[in-house]
A protein has these predicted regions:
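C-terminal substrate-binding/catalytic lobe of Rossmann-fold NAD(P)-dependent oxidoreductases
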Residues: 2-6, 10-38, 51, 120-220
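Hydrophobic beta-strand scaffold residues
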Residues: 26, 69-70, 93-94
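Short, ordered loop/turn segments at secondary-structure junctions
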Residues: 74-76, 99-100, 130-132
């Protein structure tokens, strides 16, 4: 497998290190992925960790150029239908996620199961998330994913509280409160390393799956 990294910030450098450790060829890391030559792109998986604005501008070209694409960028889900249509049109495999951490995806599975158990009870749900001050979207894509799971499971949408503090990699908490008890579930990331590891796992999965896939639906 050959990889092009779209976005060469902190996450891009972490992904580069994971690829190197796994012996996966990194063809290039670029802040201008649209300029990658077509003959190179068609042989590569693109791993995109940019900004919402950059992905919104670049996705038509990314979908047309690359063999497969892994998208860890969030903040574009309001145009999900247009994005998916572009990848469908070019028959390009897309794996996307609000969070590629394996631990977070286990957290998703736990919340889904908890909601199945609590749905007959009188519980008020809420979601809290804390991220570093550089995080552009609020609530985070992960917080929205947790809220969606809760709404589907309990039939009521939780309130989401978002905070941006220092260099916090990401902490997400789901609470369920009734008149008799409270359940609290928390995932705390110690670094962004887990996101990079999961993104590379997703890139490897593009050799086994096709179409448009959400990461959690593949691994859970």
């Amino acid at each position: 497998m050959k990889v092009v990294i779209s976005g060469y910030g902190k996450m891009g450098h972490m992904i580069e290190a994971v690829l190197q450790r796994r012996g996966i060829e990194l063809v290039m890391a670029s802040e201008d992925v649209c300029s990658v030559p077509d003959d190179i792109a068609k042989e590569c998986v693109c791993i995109d960790f940019t900004t919402p604005e950059a992905f919104r501008a670049n996705y038509p070209t990314i979908a047309a150029k690359f063999k497969a694409v892994v998208v860890g960028t969030t903040g574009w889900y309001d145009i999900k239908d247009q994005v998916f249509a572009a990848f469908d049109r070019h028959n390009t495999t897309l794996i996307w996620a609000s969070n590629f951490s394996i631990g977070v995806n286990a957290f998703f599975a736990a919340i889904q199961r908890v909601c199945e158990v609590l749905k007959e009870g009188d519980y008020t749900p809420s979601v809290k998330e804390i991220h570093h001050i550089h995080k552009l979207d609020a609530p985070s894509g992960t917080a929205k994913s947790i809220a969606d799971l809760i709404e589907k499971g309990l039939g009521r949408a939780p309130e989401i509280e978002s905070k941006r503090i220092g260099e916090v990699p990401g902490t997400h908490t789901a609470e369920f409160v009734s008149g008799v008890d409270k359940l609290v579930f928390t995932h705390e990331a110690f670094s962004r390393q887990g996101f990079a590891e999961g993104a590379v796992v997703a890139a490897l999965l593009t050799e086994k799956v096709t179409g448009i896939q959400e990461f959690k639906d593949i691994i859970l």
